[in-house]
Amino acid sequence: MKLKSVIAAFALAGLGAGMTAALPASAAAAAPALQQVAKFGHQVTGVTVSETGRIFVNFPRWTEDAPVSVAEVMKDGSIKPYPDAGWNAWRNASGDEISPADHFVCVQSVVADGHGSVWVLDPAAPATQALVPGGPKLVRIDLATNKVAKVYAFDQSVAIPGSYLNDVRFSSDGKFAFMTDSGQRGALVVLELASGKAKRVLDGHSSTQIEKGVQVHTDGKELHYPDGRKVQFSADSIALAPDGWLYWKPLTGHKLYRIQASALESKGFAGQDVAGDVQPFGEVGISDGFWIGDKATKGNGNLLYVTSPETNAVSVRDLSQGPSGALRTVVQDARLRWPDTFGQGPDGTIYVTTSHIQDSAFFKKDAPPSLPTQLWKFKPAE
């Protein structure tokens, strides 16, 4: 709906058909310790950490009418609606009585920009189905005042019917935002923050669509809906490297793609075709969240961290090795049931949510609407 040398742990075994395995590192290496930060009574997806260490999470309205959409995680692990209860007051049952323009409808992602703001991406599509008219938006909250500072609303030329705006990254100069649309027709969305104008790019391009022939597996078997439909999510994972390369891929797919952000800002935003600027960049298997560290957070801008839900793992790829670079396991743990989204603290600690998607009522008929989920952390090796 985001490090220096990396230590790998367990070799991957017993992978389902069609899955891309991460390579084990040296047997002498030890996995970083995985620690639980908080547990939730509802399905979490996004997490982000501000430059001062404040932690924020979000809860989409997928299988239940979540009582809180965006929250700050307090030091004792409890949560507090953020920025206030008012913005979190939307309920599906009373949606015709509350304005979707200034309430969180179905939040998929939260991202702190490192410059005093946290951004909330709201595709406004409960259960990933029909859009709530007037609901799709990107919201900037000022961390100093804890007040909403700006709302960027998206009309149907951007949030088209069937869309699901998934995750967002920001250009280094703070002038543009780049979003993935994992809905029925995948795309990237480029938003110029000064003007508020947004443009769909690579709309329907192969790099943003589900990859034919790819199936998502969990617990050693194919994951599908009770009616037999396969898991099909378009452009989802996204990360922006310090050198200006924007990386993304469909969730239902193995292939990684990249483009220079400058091409999106100039040609793409102007409506020009940027398909020729897209570069295939190897594979990373089925993934959900991406994170590229930077020097400010004791990271390495060449390392792409990847959540690997098929194997209950966090993996990494050294982008400096080019398209043939291998995916390696950082930490693999049975508790990482559908590792979803990354955040990184100012001390370099990496946070990751587990959204338990395979355990949800989407895929299990007898699953309760409310799904217990968790937030974890680990410290990558120096």
Give the location of each predicted region.
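Beta-rich, blade/repeat-based domains predominating
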Residues: F40-T52, D96-S117, L121, V158-A177, ...
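Conserved beta-strand positions in repeat-built beta-propeller and related beta-rich domains
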Residues: I55-E64, H103, V120-A124, Q129, ...
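Blade-level signature of beta-propeller repeat domains, shared across WD40, Kelch, NHL, RCC1
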Residues: G343-E382
